Design a protein with these regions (language model features):
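Residues at or immediately flanking beta-strands
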Residues: 86-88, 147, 251
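Short intrinsically disordered coil segments
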Residues: 52, 128-137, 294-300
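A gly/proline- and charged-residue-enriched helix-loop-helix capping module
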Residues: 50-95
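A conserved beta-strand-loop-helix scaffold within acyl/acetyltransferase catalytic domains
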Residues: 1-30, 34-46, 91-229
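Active-site/acyl-donor-binding loops of N-acyltransferases
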Residues: 21, 39, 100-125, 249-250, ...
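Aromatic (often tryptophan-rich) hydrophobic motifs at membrane interfaces
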Residues: 21-29, 34, 40, 44, ...
């Protein structure tokens, strides 16, 4: 998903990032391998290459360890020549870490990564979920009189975004710009789906999923806290999983979660109790002060915690391009 033209175009159109690809293939020949990046220029977080910003993960597309090792070492040289502050990879495959470390890259941010196996029968998938926190909440939602609407219309996007702003406000964070979601819909088309649960006509919860080949991606979720007891979010997720399973999906990617985000981590653990570790790799090594999560970002988060909700939405449009 995160290698697709639609995703890269959305990053470019929303934040002005320049998509780049590095390959060992000669000019004017068919691409045999490659690593996708975005070139980011920011007065706040510096000039850098990230593979890829606002993407939970992005695997290098190489056919051999020799190809990958060559590209890693080339990027080290290019970083010095171009005066990039750092280069960042976000791979899933653990083999990458071994090669990267041998080439001088260092581990950076670490996350939990939840993936639900959908190759089992749907009934067996449901039985694998936490009985109290997922199964019973889904069953409760089915009796609660919720109405589900699916699609990517402007009306659905507006309702989703209202809930998204509310949710981000609860966590004292600015919302991702509205234009990001508009551009995602334009770039990804039918691969993107919004699902919203309504209670008596009021949006109660919403999710946004992406589909690429046999993988369904849970990218965004939002809710109105007044309706949490209804179990609307688990219900929406299960509906999305059921529909994806029927159309051939074999995996449900729930994305990354920071260790400190205990609420979200607990929620996802009820679906996938044994998450994997997701490690980002940087060259050169980033100090806490030097990284995008350093003191400038921490100070910004403190400021956001005191902002009115409308002002936070404006600040999101201003700051997100610096923190990809």
């Amino acid at each position: 998903m995160f290698h697709t033209v639609g995703w890269l175009q959305t990053l470019q159109h929303t934040y002005g990032y320049e998509p780049l690809a590095f390959t060992t293939s000669p000019p004017d020949t068919e691409l045999a391998n490659g690593i996708a990046f975005c070139y980011i220029t920011s007065w706040l977080t510096g000039r850098r290459l990230v593979s890829l910003p606002f993407s939970d993960h992005c695997e290098p597309l190489c056919n051999s360890t020799e190809e990958l090792d060559f590209l890693l070492r080339y990027l080290q040289t290019a970083r010095k020549q171009q005066n990039w502050r750092y280069v960042e990879f976000r791979p899933i495959n653990g083999i990458f870490g071994q090669l990267a470390e041998a080439a001088g890259f260092r581990p950076g941010a670490r996350y939990f990564f939840h993936r639900l196996d959908l190759r089992l029968d749907l009934a067996d998938v449901f039985a694998s979920l936490d009985k109290d926190s997922v199964q019973r909440r889904i069953q409760h939602a089915e009796r609660a009189g919720l109405i589900e609407k699916c699609g990517r219309s402007e009306d659905l996007l507006r309702d989703f975004y209202r809930l998204f702003v509310i949710t981000r406000g609860r966590h004292q964070l600015p919302p991702t710009p509205y234009a990001w979601f508009q551009n995602l819909i334009q770039g990804l088309g039918e691969a993107l789906e919004i699902r919203i649960a309504y209670k008596d006509g009021t949006p109660a919860a919403a999710i946004l999923t992406l589909r690429f080949k046999d993988v369904l991606y849970y990218k965004y979720g939002s809710s109105d806290a007044r309706f949490h007891k209804l179990g609307a979010t688990p219900w929406l997720l299960w509906n999305a999983i059921s529909a994806a399973k029927l159309s051939g999906a074999n995996e449900f990617d729930m994305g990354r979660t920071e260790e400190g985000n205990t609420g979200l981590l607990t929620f996802k653990n009820h679906w996938v109790p044994t998450p994997k570790e997701l490690v980002y790799w940087n060259y050169p090594e980033l100090s806490a002060v030097g990284s995008a999560e350093g003191w400038k970002m921490k100070m910004a988060k403190r400021v956001f915690s005191f902002m009115p909700r409308k002002l936070m939405a404006l600040s999101g449009r201003l700051v997100y391009r610096h923190i990809g």
